[in-house]
A protein has these predicted regions:
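Short, basic, alpha-helical segments at the C-terminal edge of helix-turn-helix-like DNA-binding modules
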Residues: 39, 69-76, 80-83
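Short helix-coil-helix linker/hinge
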Residues: 15, 21-24
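N-terminal intrinsically disordered/low-complexity leader segments
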Residues: 1-16
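Hydrophobic alpha-helical connector segments
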Residues: 66, 79-108
Length: 108
């Protein structure tokens, strides 16, 4: 049996579950790198069925977009730096101040 098959799922309100999934995804992206997360990893970390990730974020690309948006809001430098280094669409909207912080993070 896989880890996902051994996970017990608890029914939650959709907004709470979506936030739980996003929080787990942000944590994983910080630890493993933005490009290295998978739907299965996020499902296991958030104790959610992988189908819920599709329900709330449609695609892995949609989930990654939400991760970067959360990283911008929370100023999570490892995620922003990785996205900026691959010229991700989401970081094009960074404020000059935040972009400067990310560049400083990358150079230290």
């Amino acid at each position: 049996m896989s880890d996902e098959e051994n996970t017990t799922y608890i029914r939650m309100k959709p907004a709470i579950r979506k936030q739980q999934i996003l929080d787990a995804a942000v944590e994983l992206a910080t630890e493993k790198g933005y490009r290295n997360i998978t739907r299965k990893d996020v499902a296991i970390a958030s104790k959610s069925a992988s189908g819920l990730i599709g329900r709330y974020f449609k695609t892995v690309a949609g989930l990654k977009k939400a991760i970067v948006e959360a990283a911008i809001e929370r100023e999570i430098m490892p995620i922003l730096a990785e996205n900026l280094s691959i010229k991700g669409e989401e970081t094009k909207s960074l404020s000059p101040e935040l972009k400067e912080k990310v560049i400083l993070y990358l150079t230290n």
